[in-house]
Design a protein with these regions (language model features):
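Donor-nucleotide binding loops and adjacent catalytic segments primarily
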Residues: 14, 18, 141-143, 150-225, ...
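Structural loop-to-beta junction motif characteristic of Rossmann-like glycosyltransferase folds
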Residues: 20, 84-85, 223-224, 241-249, ...
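A short, well-ordered alpha-helix in the C-terminal region of glycosyltransferases
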Residues: 296-308
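C-terminal alpha-helical cap of glycosyltransferases
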Residues: 307-324
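Glycosyltransferases and closely related glycan-assembly transferases
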Residues: 51-64, 71-87, 100-105
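Acidic donor-binding loop of glycosyltransferase active sites
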Residues: 61-63, 208, 220-235, 242-243
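Conserved nucleotide-sugar phosphate-binding/catalytic loop shared by glycosyltransferases and other
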Residues: 1-44, 49, 53, 128, ...
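Active-site-proximal region of nucleotide-activated glycan assembly enzymes
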Residues: 10, 21, 80-142
């Protein structure tokens, strides 16, 4: 395996830690709005295309796999020009601009959601779900409880507001916390700078800005998850078969993709969708108790999903195209 990315992308250090060969190329962002860089970035993209051709000739891969993003466009286009098969993975419900530019030259296009299939050429589309890092399946419940100082006497709710936290979700949790702690324990990932010091010593409640290494253990400890509805996060929840309540970013604060993601998961019986603007103390508590009571049905639906098999599906596609 070799990896092509931007010269100084945040992924560079992570990839190099795995001893995977990393090749940088020039990149330019694809914007839908006015920016002075719109005048210079096309030249960077063209430069990136020729650098990608050079890197691919050196690597000589059997297949190129792309997760999208502006870095991928010159690489995918260069691979097509060199007659190297390309597999694309689209994480969101609707293809982003970069993938829209890559789909015409791709051999196969994998996706997370059944609703995405209508946007893709039928002879290329594959419903795979999202590849999930294997470390997430190595979590240990008892280790997670010990890390948080919790017990096994009450079920555990894990609340995740995304990497930056979610003010509305944090406020909703704190407003009902005394009632919530009568029946549950709570692990609250609040986001950077968003913890509440007045709650530091509340029994049965722990809060962190974010968690990295121990997250797999916290996920294993959770009986119910409350989360935003980013594609990667909810696919991890699905893979772990955790009953969940999704509170997507409102349309006013996003392009609406999280709402579509949550609607799809609710339609398939994987999740309960709770719009942020509909949250009241009473509804929040009722929803938590309802989903927890119905947890076995949610787990049953998630267990039957074909979106849980992304890694073997994608590996099989790579094998097929590599042998062509």
């Amino acid at each position: 395996i070799s990896y092509i990315g931007s010269y100084e992308g945040m992924e560079k250090g992570m990839i190099m830690e795995t001893k995977t060969p990393y090749y940088g190329i020039a990149t330019g962002k694809l914007r839908r709005y006015f920016d002075l860089k719109n005048f210079t970035d096309p030249f960077r993209i063209i430069k990136g295309y020729f650098e990608a051709r050079s890197r691919l000739k050196k690597i000589h891969p059997d297949v190129v796999f792309s997760k999208g993003g502006f870095v991928a466009v010159p690489v995918v286009r260069a691979a097509h020009a060199l007659k190297i098969p390309v597999i694309i993975h689209e994480s969101d419900m609707t293809p982003g601009l970069a993938n829209k530019l890559c789909i015409p030259v791709a051999s196969k296009v994998c996706c997370n959601f059944p609703e995405t299939l209508k946007y893709l050429p039928s002879d290329k589309a594959v419903l795979s779900g999202s590849p999930i890092r294997s470390q997430l399946f190595e979590g240990d419940r008892s280790r997670g409880l010990h890390f948080c100082g919790l017990t096994s006497d009450k079920p555990v709710i894990l609340i995740m507001g995304g990497s930056l936290g979610a003010v509305a979700v944090n406020e909703a949790v704190r407003a009902v916390l005394p009632e919530l702690l009568k029946d549950f324990q709570v692990i609250h990932l609040c986001g950077k700078g968003k913890t509440d010091k007045s709650l530091n010593n509340v029994t049965g409640y722990v809060q962190y800005e974010f968690i990295k290494e121990e997250l797999r253990d916290l996920l294993a400890a959770a009986d119910l998850i409350i989360s935003r509805a980013g594609a990667n996060a909810i696919c991890e929840i699905l893979a772990l078969r955790k009953p969940n309540i999704l509170i997507p970013l409102p349309a006013a604060a996003s392009r609406g993709d999280q709402i579509l993601n949550a609607e799809s998961f609710q339609k398939q019986g994987f999740s309960y969708l709770l719009p942020e603007e509909e949250i009241t103390n009473e509804k929040f508590l009722d929803t938590i108790h309802q989903v927890y009571s119905d947890r076995e049905n949610y787990q049953k639906q998630m267990a039957s999903s074909q979106q849980n098999q992304a890694i073997p599906i994608i590996a099989d596609l790579i094998d097929q195209l590599a042998s062509v």
